[in-house]
Amino acid sequence: MAVTIAKANLGADKYPYVEPNHLSAPRDGRVYAQLPAADDIKVLTNGTFVKYDYAHGEVNFTGEGPWMMVFNEEKLYDERKQSHADFAMKKDEQVRGVMVPRVFGMVPGDIFTTNNLADGSYSVGDKVTPGADGILAAGGTVAAGTLVCAVVKETTMPDGKTPGVKLQVLSA
């Protein structure tokens, strides 16, 4: 049985997100929040992957840097009425329109649950890689040095109803 991911099913003003099951970055110091997002990036959701392009002084989708996962601190002001799906970093809500996302470097073995994948069906064993928009998708070309994750479990997000998958990083 496969899990079907469809952004349209999230609802109005809802966003995909990440549940960090076992991420090494907070323990080994690969947490970065120093580079602004490229001018053409308008929204970043947790679980989107960006290139940490230090040479050009920005995070983007096409640079020379390593793929890193956006994992911003959520700014939710009423936990009774809001959930993880209510948060995204939006350029038009930032001071002077400059987004500086917090990103996590990934290593093989990292495990996380997410619904931030391209629309489609995913089964245990599927391999996913970041697409041109930083969203993980199946069927992409795997070049040397590309981030590759494997679907290790078909599951739901912490709300118990939104379909999601548990991923393990195979190469970063």
Predicted segments, located by residue:
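Surface-exposed, low-hydrophobicity beta-strand/loop segments enriched in small/polar/acidic residues
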Residues: M1-A172
